[in-house]
Swiss-Prot record:
Residues annotated as binding ATP: K197, E314, G340, G341, D342, T343
Gene3D superfamilies documented for this protein: Phosphoglycerate kinase, N-terminal domain
UniProt organism field: Photorhabdus luminescens (Xenorhabdus luminescens)
Protein encoded by which gene: pgk
UniProt keyword annotation of Transferase present: yes
Record-given protein name: Phosphoglycerate kinase
Length: 387
């Protein structure tokens, strides 16, 4: 990957526009989960320390494009940044015709989705973004798979376009896990549907020494082995695909599971063999034997890629499987990389963030990179590096 890195540039006195991923949950005007902002702080601080005139922007939520809506304003992010940074921080609502920024000051440019043409990568909008800066820094891995005006078009027209430390770090960590992994490599793919992760499963089946499936995805594999899965979430039409994967690679299908007769937080868990599931039952977690089997596999891994929980961990009675897997990853000496919203929520719940080698901030971008797809924002940075 050949891109210009922000860390290699002299930013002093330059107008620097950072496209970050500050798309955080907000409730009653307050940020409720600051993980993405925290991940962006080192980039912001590095630019300010160099004496740059720093502007930062992001999308937040899904407002109607081209219309201002206070509900989706970046103001709560600005309030958070004011608490964390010693520099002056202000929010700029109207900025497309130009904005004044002083050295060592941080100006947050309001939600890019308030600008008409953002999502369609409108060229005239991209040029307006580009005219604001001397150096454009793409640091939002979470949106690198989208070709939009603030992630892609602007990089085409800015005087200099580079990768921020967070984006570069994400790409480097994923490259380490996928391009030439230390072996054995174990990949865990959980979540609800095979259909949304079929390409990922197929790609990883060719890279990983061991593929682990969990959640609703594992239910489809249980069904593929001929077992009744009752009212479990599974995809009948994808059983042939699951059978193909079972032939082509080693996938440990759950032999025991926790089931319930209702999908609720208070549902009672019953531990039973995968071959004994009744018509009115649904699988909501792995059984002890199956979870321990996965923990034993992870113990010997040298590289672990984790995307998705292995059960309905949000319900206390059905989080044991995900917790056993999570703690096995945390205790492993392997290089581990985790990504996806539910995965990050599980990491937070079990308090193991400091024991995962790399936590990716991207959901869709993480999966598309794993699938082997080119990320438009990264392709543009590579093109600019050649000029």
């Amino acid at each position: 990957m050949s891109v210009i890195k922000m860390t290699d540039l002299d930013l002093a006195g330059k107008r620097v526009l950072i496209r970050a991923d500050l798309n955080v949950p907000v409730k009653d005007g307050k940020v409720t989960s600051d993980a993405r902002i925290r991940a962006s702080l080192p980039t912001i601080e590095a630019a300010l320390k160099q004496g740059a005139k720093v502007m930062i922007t992001s999308h937040l939520g899904r407002p109607i494009e081209g219309e201002y809506n206070e509900e989706f304003s970046l103001k709560p992010v600005v309030d958070y940044l004011k608490e964390k940074l010693s520099s002056s921080v202000r929010l700029e609502k109207e900025y497309l015709e130009g904005v004044e920024v002083s050295e060592g000051e941080l100006v947050v440019l309001e939600n890019v989705r308030f600008n008409k043409g953002e999502k369609k990568d409108d060229e005239s909008l991209a040029k307006k973004y580009a005219s604001l800066c001397d150096i454009y820094v793409m640091d939002a891995f979470g949106t690198a798979h989208r070709a939009q005006a603030s992630t892609h078009g602007v990089a085409k027209f800015a005087p200099v376009a580079c990768a921020g430390p967070l984006l570069f770090g994400e790409l480097e960590a994923l490259g380490k896990a996928l391009d030439n992994p230390a072996r054995p490599m174990v990949a865990i793919v959980g979540g609800s549907k095979v259909s949304t992760k079929l390409t990922v499963l197929d790609t990883l089946s060719k890279i990983a020494d061991q593929l682990i499936v969990g959640g609703g995805i594992a239910n489809t594999f249980v069904a593929a082995e001929g077992h009744n899965v009752g009212r479990s979430l599974y995809e009948d039409d994808l059983i042939p695909e699951a059978k193909k994967l079972l032939i082509s690679c080693d996938i440990p299908v759950p032999t025991d599971v926790r089931v319930a007769t209702e999908f609720s937080e208070t549902a009672e868990a019953t531990l039973k063999s995968s071959s004994d599931i009744k018509d009115d039952e649904q699988i909501l977690d792995l059984g002890d034997e199956s979870a321990q089997r996965l923990a034993d596999i992870l113990k010997n891994a040298k590289t672990i890629l984790w995307n998705g929980p292995v059960g309905v961990f949000e319900f206390p009675n059905f989080r044991q499987g995900t917790e056993i897997v999570a703690r096995a990853i945390a205790d492993s000496d392997a290089f581990s990389i985790a990504g996806g919203g539910d995965t990050l929520a599980a990491i937070d719940l079990f308090g193991i963030a400091d024991k995962i080698s790399y936590i990716s901030t991207g959901g869709g971008a993480f999966l598309e990179f794993v699938e082997g797809k080119k990320l438009p924002a990264v392709v543009m940075l590579e093109e600019r590096a050649k000029q």
